[in-house]
Amino acid sequence: MVMGHYATALIPYAYNSQRKLAPFWMFLLAAQFLDFIMIAFVLMGIESLSPHQFFQASFLNMRVDMTFSHDLLPVLGWSVGLAIFAGIVCKNVMATVWVFSLCILHELFDLAVGFKHYIFGPNTMAFGLDLYNTQPIIGIIIEALVCFSILTWYLKKRSDQGEPVSKNVKIGLYAILVGATVGLLPMANQPLSHFLG
């Protein structure tokens, strides 16, 4: 899951529009933290992502080793660590709980939509539906529906709070979260190089 993780940051923000709990960037960081760790580990050679060239990658042919960033035991450690960081920065227990929850939610959504993960390493039990490698179109459609549902709920919540979001911001949010996800459909089974010639 890609944009769906960003969408989850809107859940605590709906209850925090006055920034009393934490700044929005803290929720965005928590929602995507595991992927940021993965990218850093791939760049350092600790984890791997193939094919290495972006235009050669499709969801169907993509292979990942995310042992230290996305396997279940490391995720628990990263979630606790980031939650402690949030508690120190925000000095707020609820911010700590939300940050921990967003990290765990990231993993749960990945298990439902993205690649399979293990307890800790490929020699341990695997979890997840692995839709990106088996049924990527279904995975992307589910992610788009998740983005649409969270965003629609968020906009209604803000309106109910008497703080409606402007029309332009609504359009922008739907375009970024839902539109960008739907825009991944051509890459489900074929790499971009197939379409570019």
Question: How should these model regions be labeled?
Answer:
Residues 1-197:
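N-terminal membrane-targeting hydrophobic helices
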